[in-house]
């Protein structure tokens, strides 16, 4: 069983080292030459940075076995959402400051959405 933990750490460090080498291979351009030459060098540098970023995402997804994209969050339908404040959710304090909330129908606050 010895060495198991090191294997997983090595498996995680390998893609990190590859990505580090990729970024180090593309240093920021030197600020010399005419304005147009500097602009062109920066433009080419940004294009290379985009390519490195894409390659890095591919390396991570292939080495770690999962996508780098975040998992989409499932939200309830808008029809089920409300602005009702009279429901006690159990959060907050006992002695809240200010006047009590007056329950209002959402249609009166938001309107029907029709232009007058």
Curated annotation (Swiss-Prot):
Primary location: host cell
Compartment(s) of residence: Host nucleus, Host nucleolus; Host cytoplasm
Sequence motif: Nuclear export signal and binding to XPO1, positions: 73-84
Organism superkingdom: Viruses
Residues where Phosphoserine is found: 8, 99
Post-translational modification note: Asymmetrically arginine dimethylated at one site by host PRMT6. Methylation impairs the RNA-binding activity and export of viral RNA from the nucleus to the cytoplasm.
Residue span of motif Nuclear localization signal and RNA-binding (RRE): 34-50
RNA-binding as UniProt keyword: yes
Region feature Homomultimerization, mapped onto this chain: 18-26
Entry keyword set: AIDS, Host cytoplasm, Host nucleus, Host-virus interaction, Methylation, mRNA transport, Phosphoprotein, RNA-binding, Transport
Family classification: Belongs to the HIV-1 REV protein family.
Protein's recorded name: Protein Rev
Species name: Human immunodeficiency virus type 1 group M subtype K (isolate 97ZR-EQTB11)
